[in-house]
Amino acid sequence: LYVIMFLFLLVLGLNSYAILRRALLKNAKQLGTSLARSYAAEERSNLTVYETLLSFGTLNLDRLAEEEAWEDERKELWILQYFKRVQAVVGDGRVDPYAVMNGKIIAANPWEGDNSYDYAQTNWYRMAEEAEGEVIFTDVYTDVIYDRPVITVAQKCVTDDIVIAFDIFLENFQFEAGGFYLPQNASFYLCDKNGRMIWYDTTLTGYPQEEIQAYIDGLLERVENGELEDYDAYVRSPDNDRRAVYYYEMSNGWQVILTVPYNTLLGGLGQFTTVFFIVMMLSLIH
């Protein structure tokens, strides 16, 4: 009878563990997805600031062209003053604003060789031309002037041959993402629509960025293949930590990824299991 009771309690305990584990992981899936969505919404609201500033510039230039018929020289002075206001709003050095007006580059921070810069062949300029007055965001690329990874936000005037653009260096996204609250030992990754990291806050300290990028590439491939949709799906990070993955795609194609260690998700359950087996072992001794 004693053995039967022991086996009954053991089976009951194992079954309870499985039920609790399933419930915890399912709840974590819902919460993690909601967190990823909220982080995406927060980042979207920050990007709206750049969109609003660009639209302010292009709308005013369109108005000046239609109502007041300003000459190019006067427009150029207005654009330079507008750039100063933009930098005052977002913070000095956070964006590098410039414009192309009738084939001429107007820059808040002029660079050497700007007269020979083939802007018409750049991705940001072609995207702005094709967007018919909508704001565009490029993917991450290496800027030929500064030789640094950058994202360009640009918009073309509707009634005038002017394109305004802001270069945003990736380190300047830290301010926006830095306000996010992350679960214990969680990692956050913001990527462009091609999966290249824009900004990240990770526990993988000491790992080179190239290795982290390769890890994200593999993770996104598994997301695309539907391999991480189950509530108990996980990945192994470069430090061999088992992690749940929560993902959300923003309206502009950027991707938000949140990874949380299983130890964080199931920490309390592990303690329960340890206590249960200690009690069971003690019952065997007595």
Regions found by a protein language model. Give the residues of each.
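Extracytoplasmic/periplasmic sensory segments of membrane signal-transduction proteins
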Residues: 30-134
